[in-house]
Amino acid sequence: MQYVTLSDSLRLSRVVAGCMRTVGAGISGEELRTFVHRCLELGIDSFDHAPVYGAGACEQMFGDEVLKVEPSLRDQIKIVTKAGIILPGQRGNRHIYYASPKENLLKEMDASLKRLSTDHVDLLLIHRPDVLGDPEQTAMALEQIVREGKALHVGVSNYEPSQFETLQSYLSIPLLVNQMEVSVKATYNFFNGVVDTAMKHKTGIMAWSPLGGGSVFAGQDEQSVRLRETLSEIAEAKGVAMDTVMYAFVLRHPAKMMVITGTMNPQRLQN
């Protein structure tokens, strides 16, 4: 397994185990622990969470069934989580919205730590830009969270270059990661300055949905069909699975991107 060193105290595996489907996959606590152990055997020590995954249930299951049952695993893994998205009904709201004021981020951080059964996460990301938010307030929250040791490092997710640089200008600590969509089908971040800005600042890039959300495998739109034909040819020539080619597309980029997997199946993870 290859790793990305983002600071003197943060090194993440280039393959990150995404935990968005922890609950939806219908696996038991024992199966989840088996999955975590298999990840570690493969060198995958980084796990991606968010409060909105299963409306908190995914973090809760990971905390209850992994870290409470086997506390020693905490020192072997890196936990990434996020904050800043309010789901419908959480605060009397009908629609999802993004909110990154100081008090909201502090409360979300505490709630995630409680669900995950840990006293800190290794990396906290602002999940989505809050276009009506005050970046100074967001920065104050991140500084306090790091100062209190609740998150060892911070970053963002889905930030445009100007949004990234604006928030960074209010911080005395670096934003170490920008998590973004990157795949053979979703290449827009190569052309809008997001990837270039990350490389300029030596910011880690964590690619979500590197398999295109599955649409390349089954989609009937022209782009999906064309990509599927080309990827199948390459996969056959190389003697590998098509998803391996899709991961390779992201991993070969000079930015040394990380990819977030979506499977909870240890066998698929190995492939």
What are these regions (language model features)?
Residues 17, 39, 47, 62, ...:
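Conserved, mostly hydrophobic/aromatic
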Residues 6-24, 80-96, 120, 125:
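N-terminal small/glycine-rich loop or linker at the start of catalytic domains
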Residues 7-11, 41, 65-78, 113-117, ...:
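Acidic (Asp/Glu)-rich catalytic clusters
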Residues 129-271:
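Beta/alpha (TIM)-barrel catalytic core signal, keyed to glycine-rich beta->alpha loops juxtaposed to Asp/Glu
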Residues 26-39, 98-116, 137, 162-165:
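Short, acidic/polar
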